[in-house]
Amino acid sequence: MDEFLNTLDALGLTENTIVVLTSDNGPVLDDGYKDRAVELVGEHRPAGPLRGWKTTMYDGGVRIPFMLRWPAVVKPQVSDAFVCQMDLLASFAKLLGVTYPDKLDSRSTLKAFLGKSKKGREALVIEGMFNYAYRKGDWALIPPYRNHPHCLLYNLKEDIGQQHNVAEKYPDKVKELTDEFEALKESTGKKTKF
């Protein structure tokens, strides 16, 4: 990355070039490769305080780093805006004045990407391998799947590590989020029920 950024500097392109650095999923250690990752990780926690890893619907598997650099426009800052990689399409299309099919899942969160708003998406369906999660505001809902027969609900504002399932404590919130999730899924033609 350093070489790439230095090349932009050398070519005089830094100020007007958008650079995005992100990942496709959270960390993974025990993935079947004989790389000794589990033994070598020691006390290090690759996902920090987040629970889970790649292939899980916990934030450790789906909350990923996202850095955007555009020196002429975006001032250095940290943001907690809720954004998603698929929103790059709609956001860059808006930035460039380009139209795109409105049936896509991409939504413009351009103001958040440019540091002009602390608010991004309101909600997001996250799909993994045979499992889903639904995020809305401070809430994360993980519907039942495979070996998990019960719905999981987490208040991320109070429990970023997703250690305390509060589904039984907030049945109305579970119903609200489940109904929204099912409606969104149905609108895409997905037949999977939980």
Where are these regions (language model features)?
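Structural scaffold positions in well-ordered secondary structure
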Residues: 1, 19-21, 65, 88, ...
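Metal-dependent active-site segment of extracytoplasmic phospho-/sulfohydrolases and closely related
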Residues: 1-34
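Extracytoplasmic/secreted proteins, especially bacterial periplasmic and envelope-associated proteins
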Residues: 3, 12, 45, 87, ...
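Surface-exposed helix-capping loop/turn segments at secondary-structure junctions
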Residues: 3-16, 94-103, 182-194
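Loop/turn elements at helix/coil->beta-strand transitions in domains of secreted/extracellular proteins
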Residues: 13-19, 120-122, 136-139, 173
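C-terminal cap/loop subdomain of S1 sulfatases and analogous C-terminal strand-loop tails that border
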Residues: 27-57, 69, 73-156, 187-191
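A structural motif
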Residues: 59-64
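Intrinsically disordered, low-complexity polar regions and short flexible loop motifs
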Residues: 159
